[in-house]
């Protein structure tokens, strides 16, 4: 499932480190990747205690030669025992925030990566390397588009962005066509999901949901009114912070069966919608702190993140207002997203390179130190399947799951 967190980013590199390099312990688990050429060979690790002194000396000399010829600067600091990710360097400006990623089901090695500053990258090797793609119809205008969401079904794909732009492909992304949109669209498009042949579902940050079945040339409303209209019409709903509501969504997530959960812009309540319902259903938050993000667990339940680093799981499955807090080691940094690799294993990511993993369905979480030296916010965790996953961050940070 895809999500969008509208959060401010931080600088990726510490002042003392050149943007071209990242200091880390050399490990087969966390390997810097270059988009245009293979990375330099890693230096040998330290020898085991069973090796003789002469063998140890030979390894040290080899390491010195290797490091002098490579572009890696300084000692490695990643924790190789916990690391399940590798850094993939991208051919983009440092200030770009990565927002979404998707792969073509009919061509599993081919995928696309979106971001701010009209960023569109393509991979044909499963995400190891990426190359820039351009959209001529978008470049003809003076706008600097923010591509928010992408989705594929078969070889058909959709991209939406801000200012309002809709792109469609029928050939796995080889060509992208610009689809005209109504200027009366309420809010900014933040999410799109390819559903069936020539069909998609689109959501705006004001809660409008539209569906199309003819490649986007006509859209039909799946909901009768925007969230603000619903809340202001039902002032006596008992939802804290909902009266005279004029805000937007700060996050929206879709379950595989088409249900939505969204967070109000101020984080003081959340909303849900199921296919067939005429309106969004508002819910009081069950925690004291404001909500940062929400989404769906692999078992059909909900996860909830609060500002400041708290993580909660709903009791049971389905939509509910009952949540239980789960202890996490976030070092005081906020957790921004959760992505499930399987029903039992999930990863959480957040500020200052925080990566957490659970192997028991969320009952306990352990910190992976792989990204500790990446001074960036990690905004989104995306698993295409149990072998292909990515973490997206600000300043062009992309981590690839290597297991």
Swiss-Prot record:
Its main location: plastid. Residues 1-53, 54-78 form a transit peptide. It comes from the Eukaryota. PANTHER family: PHOTOSYSTEM II STABILITY/ASSEMBLY FACTOR HCF136, CHLOROPLASTIC (PTHR47199), PHOTOSYSTEM II STABILITY_ASSEMBLY FACTOR HCF136, CHLOROPLASTIC (PTHR47199:SF2). Interacts with PAM68. A 7-bladed beta-propeller torus, about 54 by 55 Angstroms, with a depth of about 25 Angstroms and a central pore. Belongs to the Ycf48 family. This is Photosystem II stability/assembly factor HCF136, chloroplastic. It comes from Arabidopsis thaliana (Mouse-ear cress).
């Amino acid at each position: 499932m895809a999500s969008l967190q509208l959060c401010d980013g931080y600088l990726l590199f510490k002042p003392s480190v050149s943007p071209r390099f990242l200091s880390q312990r050399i490990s087969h688990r966390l390997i810097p990747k270059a988009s245009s050429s293979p990375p330099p060979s890693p230096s040998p690790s330290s020898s085991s205690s069973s090796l003789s002194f002469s063998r140890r000396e030979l390894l040290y000399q080899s390491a010195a030669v290797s490091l002098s010829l490579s572009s890696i600067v300084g000692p490695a600091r990643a924790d190789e025992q916990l690391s399940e990710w590798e850094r993939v360097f991208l051919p983009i400006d440092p200030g770009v925030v990565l927002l979404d990623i998707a792969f073509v089901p009919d061509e599993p090695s081919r995928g696309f990566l979106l971001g701010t500053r009209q960023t569109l990258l393509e991979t044909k090797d499963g995400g190891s390397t990426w190359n820039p793609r351009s959209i001529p119809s978008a470049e003809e205008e003076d706008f600097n588009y923010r591509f928010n969401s992408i989705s594929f079904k078969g070889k058909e794909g959709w991209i939406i962005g801000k200012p309002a732009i809709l792109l469609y492909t029928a050939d796995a992304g080889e060509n992208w066509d610009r689809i005209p949109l109504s200027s009366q669209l309420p809010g900014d498009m933040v999410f799109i999901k390819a559903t069936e042949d020539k069909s998609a579902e689109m959501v705006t940050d004001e809660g409008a949901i539209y569906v199309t079945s003819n490649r986007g040339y006509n859209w039909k409303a799946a909901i009768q009114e925007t969230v603000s209209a619903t809340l202001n019409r039902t002032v006596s709903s008992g939802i804290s912070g909902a009266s005279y509501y004029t805000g937007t969504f700060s996050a929206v997530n879709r379950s595989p069966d088409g249900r939505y959960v969204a967070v109000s812009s101020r984080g003081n309540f959340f909303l849900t919608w199921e296919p067939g319902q005429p309106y969004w259903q508002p819910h009081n938050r069950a925690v004291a702190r404001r909500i940062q993000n929400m989404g769906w667990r692999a078992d059909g339940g909900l996860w909830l993140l609060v500002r400041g680093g708290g993580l909660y799981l709903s009791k049971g499955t389905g939509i509910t207002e009952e949540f239980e807090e789960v202890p996490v080691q976030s070092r005081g940094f906020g957790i921004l997203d959760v992505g499930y690799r399987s029903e039992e294993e999930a990863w959480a990511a957040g500020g200052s390179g925080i990566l957490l993993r659970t192997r028991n369905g969320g009952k306990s979480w352990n910190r992976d130190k792989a990204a500790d030296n990446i001074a960036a916010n990690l905004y989104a965790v995306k698993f295409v399947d149990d072998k292909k996953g990515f973490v997206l961050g600000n300043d062009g940070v992309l981590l690839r799951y290597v297991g």
